Amino acid sequence: MAARIRKGDRVVVIAGASKGREGEVLRVLPAENKAVVSGVAVAKRHTKARGMGEQGGIIQKEMPVHLSNIALIDPETKKPTRVGFRVLEDGRKVRVARKSDSVIDG
């Protein structure tokens, strides 16, 4: 199945503890239906020192967010939108913003 959310997309969180925050998709986990978004769902992890060069301590790590809790930001209107697909005349399948009907990529 084609991905509606891809790496590099600007998204907004529409549900959950981070509701309203915007960020860029760093990684998509299709097997889990989740995505890692910059600045969203940040958790603190306690790590041990590994070897001589690496330091232990508390690090902040972005955790995955379920795809149903994020919405793509329409590049034209700068508002959250759903994503559809359309096949162009030259045969390419592209993503389309449902609100503005504009092509997102391609």
From Swiss-Prot:
<comment type="function">
    <text>One of the proteins that surrounds the polypeptide exit tunnel on the outside of the subunit.</text>
</comment>
<dbReference type="GO" id="GO:0005840">
    <property type="term" value="C:ribosome"/>
</dbReference>
<dbReference type="GO" id="GO:0019843">
    <property type="term" value="F:rRNA binding"/>
</dbReference>
<dbReference type="Pfam" id="PF00467">
    <property type="entry name" value="KOW"/>
</dbReference>
<comment type="subunit">
    <text>Part of the 50S ribosomal subunit.</text>
</comment>
<comment type="function">
    <text>One of two assembly initiator proteins, it binds directly to the 5'-end of the 23S rRNA, where it nucleates assembly of the 50S subunit.</text>
</comment>
<dbReference type="InterPro" id="IPR014722">
    <property type="entry name" value="Rib_uL2_dom2"/>
</dbReference>
<protein>
    <recommendedName>
        <fullName>Large ribosomal subunit protein uL24</fullName>
    </recommendedName>
</protein>
<dbReference type="InterPro" id="IPR041988">
    <property type="entry name" value="Ribosomal_uL24_KOW"/>
</dbReference>
<keyword id="KW-0687">Ribonucleoprotein</keyword>
<dbReference type="InterPro" id="IPR008991">
    <property type="entry name" value="Translation_prot_SH3-like_sf"/>
</dbReference>
<keyword id="KW-0699">rRNA-binding</keyword>
<dbReference type="InterPro" id="IPR003256">
    <property type="entry name" value="Ribosomal_uL24"/>
</dbReference>
<keyword id="KW-0689">Ribosomal protein</keyword>
<comment type="similarity">
    <text>Belongs to the universal ribosomal protein uL24 family.</text>
</comment>
<dbReference type="InterPro" id="IPR005825">
    <property type="entry name" value="Ribosomal_uL24_CS"/>
</dbReference>
<dbReference type="GO" id="GO:1990904">
    <property type="term" value="C:ribonucleoprotein complex"/>
</dbReference>
<dbReference type="GO" id="GO:0003735">
    <property type="term" value="F:structural constituent of ribosome"/>
</dbReference>
<dbReference type="InterPro" id="IPR005824">
    <property type="entry name" value="KOW"/>
</dbReference>
<dbReference type="GO" id="GO:0006412">
    <property type="term" value="P:translation"/>
</dbReference>
<dbReference type="Pfam" id="PF17136">
    <property type="entry name" value="ribosomal_L24"/>
</dbReference>
<keyword id="KW-0694">RNA-binding</keyword>
